[in-house]
A protein has these predicted regions:
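C-terminal interaction segment
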Residues: 2-33, 47-50, 68-73, 89-111, ...
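Short, surface-exposed beta-edge/turn micro-motifs
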Residues: 79, 148-150
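Acidic-basic catalytic patches of nuclease active cores, encompassing PD-(D/E)XK
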Residues: 34-82
Length: 221
């Protein structure tokens, strides 16, 4: 199982900002773009139940800031949904999370899902270039910094489900990790490490009939 681990010098541990020190809202940005986003993210949150981990050691989070760079502690990305395994679902085993701080947890998400919308599609598909003195794009953060093993994007308008897996160039291990597109037979992705699948499901959720992205067990959708 590939789980990104992040380490920091012990001398800095006590001086680093904690979850309580960092903003929990999306600074300077509007709220969720439509009704679909929170419903779809909530379905992912509810169905992410990896059988290899106790529920209290699984974080299934939606619309939560992820702080990823201790050198720039206010830089963050805010995935529509992400899952982490091997960490407490509570902050320091006791508190509901305001955000997810990589330099405290030292474990990257194992999977991130972004729900495409017209204003964010280019960045979420890695089609934008970072400008000088600006934070890295979502794609760069997920691929290069956090090295999130599975990155998924879902376009509700085209009913298009795409997934990428982070891989190192075996011929040249010194090269950085890169996302490679995965084949998705029947619009399904099986995550063997988690004994869990992710796929497009036709059904009624919260009173709405349609196509939804959800996790499923080996027994199927």
């Amino acid at each position: 199982l590939f789980i990104g681990m992040v380490s920091f010098p012990r001398s800095k541990q006590n001086s680093l900002l904690t979850m309580y020190d960092l903003p929990s809202e999306e600074v300077g940005e509007p709220g969720l773009p439509d009704e679909f986003h929170p419903l779809q993210a909530l379905l992912l949150r509810k169905t992410f139940q990896p059988r290899r981990y106790w529920p209290e050691r699984v974080l299934s989070a939606m619309d939560l800031n992820v702080y990823y760079d201790v050198q720039h502690p206010l830089w963050y990305k805010r995935p529509d949904w992400f899952g982490v395994v091997g960490v407490s679902c509570l902050y320091e085993e006791q508190d509901l999370r305001w955000s997810y701080v990589i330099w405290q947890e030292k474990v990257s998400p194992i999977i991130v899902v972004e729900l495409l919308s017209p204003g964010t599609e280019a960045e979420e598909l890695g089609q934008t270039v970072r400008q000088a003195n600006e934070p890295p794009t979502k794609w760069e953060v997920y691929e290069q910094i956090l090295q999130v093993p599975y990155y998924v994007v879902y376009d509700r308008y085209e009913h298009q489900f795409r997934a990428f897996h982070v891989e190192r160039d075996r011929a040249n291990p010194a090269k950085p990790y890169r996302y490679q597109a995965l084949a998705l037979p029947d619009k399904r992705l099986w995550l063997q490490e988690l004994e869990l699948g992710l796929g497009v499901w036709q059904g009624n959720y919260d009173g709405y009939d349609g196509l939804w992205l959800r996790f499923y067990q080996a027994s199927g959708l």
